[in-house]
């Protein structure tokens, strides 16, 4: 890797030195003596380091072995393209002669998905590493100083050029875009601050797609980098981030597939950050304007009719009243399954008051509700609303634009760390297999349906973890080397059985529903095979 790093940082004569030096750098990547990949990988690829002339855009590439020794090539390629007055470009490029024989790689949704996550991570890394070196004048710097990587939404779309705004941002690379603008589907500028990481992740991505991982001595580094960029596929939502967003936007909706902990994090926030000020409610198809905002409700009395109607506050006005009574305390209203009700009807004219940037906005209500509310609804500045929404429930109508504009949306994703910490061997393996299927084959619409981590951990896992720690202390007094007793092993066996039962009774029905509803049509065979595997446990 050192020679490749030097190739990208040293000023070389592109015409005379570049081809030979780049070939040497590529060759140094293979073999246990300082290399990163096994030599058998050479059977799958060849180096293309053509001589440079004035008519040719200079490049050096690792391409599929089936290509001819010269001329245009096809398939997936890792390419480094030098330019005279700037850093080289590191890129993934589909050959000008087509994507065959790598159509099974480039055509997968996961190929583009991972390429986009890698470039997002590299941009974040570059911003982080250069932030401390910036001064106040940097606000005037061009986008080229803030963004150094880009990826096409769909790598297979070789009919689409690199967008004009991207090409203008990286104007030093105009000749490259003019020549290979349709074939480039991911690139990173070889800025020194992130160069080593960029080379590794692009190369690792290229060889992983061909079925090769780095050598044993590079495995730790490989997994560290892979885990880092993989987080951009499924970002973690932290309580502090959610709290900051609520303070800034006031009205937030957490959306994600089932089992990702949307309700849990909402209730934890209510208990810890809001000190219990507020309350959780749940919407359903029968939720009405009267139950949420307020209205006339019958009550028995001693009149001739035996009943009368009373103006009664709904769930929203109740918490508004409490927030108005204690303006120095923050209040949180949690609306679980917010999209299960017809929000336009439930909110009515009150939607006009949901304007986070206009605290003075008020709405005249149909009745006088008394108290601090009266007949005018004005959302208190200390009241925040947090909704949760299950993206797997496609039977529910999409929220209309007027409602979406007033809420900030935050995606909740399955978290591999939770499964690794609390799952059993069986559920960890099951999680990673299913995650791989969704990452590789799911469309963007289906990808958000990846079942959450709670399907892969036993319900009492936290108690089991505590018991494990207590048992370990006892074991230390009985046997050395922290050996588990037969009783411990039996308990773990029962926990494994419980975990497998949970997969069969909770996860499989969800996946079957996905198949029946047509949510996973494009990769239903893979899901069907996965279900069969789980059923055989």
Tell where the protein language model's regions lie, with residue ranges.
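Histidine-centered divalent-metal-coordination microenvironment in nucleic-acid enzymes
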Residues: 75-81, 89-91, 454
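N-terminal "first-domain core" detector
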Residues: 1-34
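Short, charged/polar surface micro-motifs in flexible loops or helix N-caps
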Residues: 53-57, 65-68, 83-88, 97-99, ...
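AAA+ P-loop NTPase catalytic core and its hallmark functional loops
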Residues: 212-445, 461-468, 477, 505, ...
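Long, intrinsically disordered low-complexity tandem-repeat segments
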Residues: 462-493
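Amphipathic, interaction-prone secondary-structure segments
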Residues: 40-80
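ATP-dependent helicase/translocase motor core
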Residues: 140-251, 264-265
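Compact, glycine/acidic-enriched structural inserts
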Residues: 18, 83-160
């Amino acid at each position: 890797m050192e020679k490749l790093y030097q190739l990208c940082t040293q000023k070389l004569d592109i015409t005379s030195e570049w081809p030979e030096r780049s070939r040497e750098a590529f060759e140094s990547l293979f073999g246990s003596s300082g290399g990163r990949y096994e030599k058998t990988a050479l059977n799958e690829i060849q180096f293309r380091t053509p001589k440079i002339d004035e008519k040719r855009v200079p490049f050096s590439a690792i391409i599929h072995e089936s290509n001819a020794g010269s001329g245009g090539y096809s398939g997936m390629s890792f390419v480094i393209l030098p330019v005279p007055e700037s850093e080289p470009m590191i890129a993934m490029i589909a050959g000008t002669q087509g994507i065959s024989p790598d159509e099974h790689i480039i055509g997968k949704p996961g190929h583009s998905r991972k390429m986009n996550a890698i470039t997002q991570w590299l941009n974040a890394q570059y911003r982080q590493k250069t932030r401390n070196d910036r001064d106040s004048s940097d606000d005037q710097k061009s986008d080229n100083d803030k963004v150094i990587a880009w990826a096409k939404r769909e790598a297979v779309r070789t009919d689409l050029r690199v967008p004009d705004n991207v090409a203008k941002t990286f104007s030093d690379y105009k000749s490259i875009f003019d020549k290979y603008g349709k074939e480039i589907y991911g690139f990173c500028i070889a800025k020194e601050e992130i160069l080593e990481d960029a080379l590794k992740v692009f190369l690792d991505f290229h060889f992983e797609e061909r079925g090769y991982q780095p050598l044993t001595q590079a495995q730790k580094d490989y997994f560290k980098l892979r885990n880092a960029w993989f987080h951009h596929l499924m970002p973690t939502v932290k309580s502090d981030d959610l709290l900051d967003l609520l303070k800034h936007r006031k009205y937030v909706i957490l959306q994600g597939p089932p089992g990702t902990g949307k309700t849990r994090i909402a209730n934890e926030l209510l208990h810890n950050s809001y000190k219990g000020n507020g309350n959780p409610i749940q919407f359903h198809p029968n939720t009405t304007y009267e139950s949420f905002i307020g209205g006339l409700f019958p009550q028995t009395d001693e009149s001739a009719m035996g009943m009368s109607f009373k103006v009664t506050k709904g769930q929203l006005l109740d918490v508004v009243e409490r927030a108005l009574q204690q303006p120095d305390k923050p209040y949180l209203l949690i609306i679980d399954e917010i999209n299960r009700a017809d929000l336009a009807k439930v909110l009515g004219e009150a939607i006009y008051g949901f304007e986070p940037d206009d605290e003075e906005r008020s709405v005249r209500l149909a009745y006088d509700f008394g108290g601090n509310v009266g007949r005018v609804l004005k959302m208190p500045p200390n009241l925040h609303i947090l909704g949760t929404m299950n993206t797997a429930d496609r039977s529910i109508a999409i929220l209309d634009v007027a409602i979406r504009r007033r809420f900030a949306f935050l995606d909740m994703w399955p978290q591999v760390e939770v499964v690794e910490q609390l799952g059993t061997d069986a559920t960890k393996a099951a999680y990673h297999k299913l995650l791989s299927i969704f990452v590789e084959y799911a469309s963007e619409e289906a990808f958000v349906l990846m079942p959450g981590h709670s399907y892969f951990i036993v319900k009492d896992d936290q108690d089991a973890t505590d018991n494990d720690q207590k048992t370990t202390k006892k074991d230390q007094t009985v046997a050395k080397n922290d050996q588990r007793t037969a009783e411990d092993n039996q308990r773990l066996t029962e926990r494994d059985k419980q975990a497998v039962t949970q997969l069969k009774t909770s996860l499989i029905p969800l996946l079957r529903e996905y198949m029946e509803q047509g949510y996973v049509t494009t990769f239903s065979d893979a899901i069907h095979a996965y279900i069969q595997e789980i059923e055989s446990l």
